[in-house]
């Protein structure tokens, strides 16, 4: 059966409230001091990037498991309905919850996942190959431009910073189109 597929890359990420210090320019002989939050808190995102348009969609699950992955896929499908006559080719890594998601939807073909099955064909990346998933670059750039070398006094401040960064990429844009296309 011949069908038209739209490529979509998916992955999850945590952003920690702890300050991450990276290289920077400092006056010779000076030692920079960087504040750091005294706790271990994080905010989590499940992201989908469409290289054809450069659009980024994110959901905010509390934790990562097959149920939250399925919820995230459904949220993506509501926000980005599949065009008539097409399906999404959803590229995922080998996280255990991704394997279970794919098994339940495609292999066991459970009826409660028919809505996803008719819209999505899954593609599994080879093990240990984050370099083949361009959404990893989205996470890297977001950290580099928004969270590295920055002190966040609260988790809500970190979340609003990351949300604002992702909002810029929610509409079609050339930056993600270029970043997420293999040439």
Outline where the language-model segments fall.
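Short functional hotspots at interaction and active-site rims
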Residues: 1-183
